[in-house]
Structures are given as structure tokens and as C-alpha cells.
Curated annotation (Swiss-Prot):
It holds the Pfam family CT_584-like. It comes from Chlamydia trachomatis serovar D (strain ATCC VR-885 / DSM 19411 / UW-3/Cx). This is Protein CT_584. Belongs to the chlamydial CPn_0803/CT_584/TC_0873 family. InterPro entries: CT_584-like.
Length: 183
């Protein structure tokens, strides 16, 4: 016999207060503190009730209603999920990994007897950078990054991280072998 989850009692004003505050937060560009602002709003709207705070976090971050709600409140909750789940997830990602590389693209140009690469890097936080390299600079950059991976291998956490990307390392090896055979 399955038990029906208990119905959570939430003041109707909580949904209005939450919606108003979330609209205010996301009316400006998402930055490193946006997720913290979201956390503060949830804690304030929960008025010290940990169970309610957990419910609101799960609802807004993962789109899940962990407990039953009355029909009207369920509709309000679904509306908040539709409006704010994605911006909240983006804010969380920027908060946790904002400076990490999100995307890299390169274009190759021929310039006076040499190949030049226009490398565009986009970070999780949306900032973009242009890095121009030629073949020699590209090799220097690869050598530097490979030495960083070798350094990571000497650290237990780094070694574990490298084991997790073994397929990528095998692919790199194959690419290096292909490059050295053709030169």
C-alpha cells in the first residue's frame, strides 16, 4: 500500500512574495551573486520553516513538488517552475562554475605564409574572449595544458579526475599519433 504524501500548508501570500522577489532578481543580468540572492529570498519566504525552504528549493531548482499542494497552490507552484526554473539553474551554474570554459570555437586563416587561428572562448558566465594563435603558439598552449594535466596526475583528486576522462585522453593520443604520422 502506497501512502499519499502529506499536503504541505503554505500561505497563499508566500507564492506572491516569492514571485515578486524572483521577478526583481531576474529583471537584471544574472551574475555571481544571483544564486545567493535566490537563496535569501527562499529562506525569507519560508520564514524559518526548514521543511518549506527545502520544498521551495526542490520545486524551483528541479521542478519537483515533494509534497501535495491544494489545487490553486499547485497551479501557482507550476507557474513559478515554468517562469523561474531555467534562470535559477543558470544562476546556480554561474555561481558554481562561472569562470569555467563553456564553449570553444576556432577559425583558421592563412596569413602571409602561416596559418593563424582565431580561437573564441565562451565562459559559463557568458563572457567571451578572442585568442589569436599561430601553429607555434597553438603547440605552446597545448604543451602548457598537457603539463598541467601531468601535474594533476600527481594529486589524488587530479588522478581520479583524469581516470574519469580516460576516453578523452585516448582520443587525444590518437589525434597526436595522426598528427605526427602526417608531418
Amino acid at each position: 500500500m502506497t501512502t499519499k504524501p502529506k499536503t504541505l500548508e503554505i500561505d497563499n501570500n508566500t507564492f506572491l512574495l516569492l514571485e515578486g522577489n524572483l521577478k526583481r532578481i531576474f529583471a537584471t543580468p544574472i551574475g555571481y551573486t544571483t544564486f545567493r540572492e535566490f537563496q535569501n529570498v527562499v529562506f525569507n519566504c519560508a520564514q524559518g520553516q526548514q521543511e518549506l525552504a527545502n520544498f521551495l528549493f526542490e520545486m524551483l531548482i528541479n521542478g519537483k513538488l515533494l509534497q501535495e499542494l491544494p489545487a490553486g497552490q499547485k497551479q501557482s507552484a507550476q507557474s513559478l517552475i515554468v517562469q523561474f526554473m531555467m534562470p535559477i539553474r543558470v544562476a546556480k551554474d554561474i555561481h558554481e562554475r562561472g569562470e569555467f570554459i563553456n564553449f570553444i570555437t576556432s577559425d583558421m586563416l592563412a596569413q602571409q605564409e602561416r596559418c593563424v587561428f582565431l580561437n573564441r572562448l565562451s565562459r559559463v558566465d557568458g563572457q567571451e574572449f578572442l585568442l589569436m594563435t599561430d601553429v607555434q603558439n597553438t603547440c605552446h598552449l597545448i604543451r602548457h595544458l598537457l603539463s598541467r594535466l601531468l601535474e594533476a596526475q600527481k594529486n589524488p583528486i587530479g588522478e581520479k579526475n583524469l581516470q574519469e576522462i580516460q576516453e578523452d585522453l585516448d582520443s587525444l593520443r590518437a589525434h597526436f599519433e595522426e598528427l605526427t604520422k602526417s608531418v
